[in-house]
Amino acid sequence: MPNLNQFIALGDSLTEGLSDKYPDGSYRGWADRVADEMSKQDSDFRYANLAVRGKLIEQVVADQLQVALPWMQQAQTLVTFHAGANNVLRPKFEPEQVFETYKNAVAQILDTGAKLLLFTVREV
């Protein structure tokens, strides 16, 4: 695997790290922990966690993905993407629309050449 010197995390509360607290009450989620380990491999390592709790997939794409796309072209980048869970919780959830948005977002990320790690909503 090539040296990955950049990590961009996109998504909602799962990626933001909500409910994963330090003793002082501040958040430090899985993405922060992964970034800590990745930074040990490269002194020029860069990390951006753009995830925000409560965001719908359309908001993740508009507010996070579109901002991050230019940065994905600049380095050996790992991108994580988790979105759609908050859509599922809505009364008028439209799975086909969410899936289409998800597919388009994945295609945009893959077109940059970045390495992509996907997370999905757990089946219940």
Functional labels for PLM-detected ranges:
Residues 27-31, 61, 102:
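A structural signal for well-ordered alpha-helical scaffolds and beta->alpha junctions
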Residues 55-63:
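Structural motif
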Residues 1-51, 69-73:
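Serine-esterase "nucleophile elbow" of acetyl-processing enzymes
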Residues 2, 63-124:
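Alpha-helical cap/lid subdomain in secreted, periplasmic
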Residues 14, 51-55, 83-84, 88:
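Cell-envelope and extracellular/periplasmic
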Residues 19-24, 59-60, 90-95:
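Short, solvent-exposed loop/turn segments at secondary-structure boundaries
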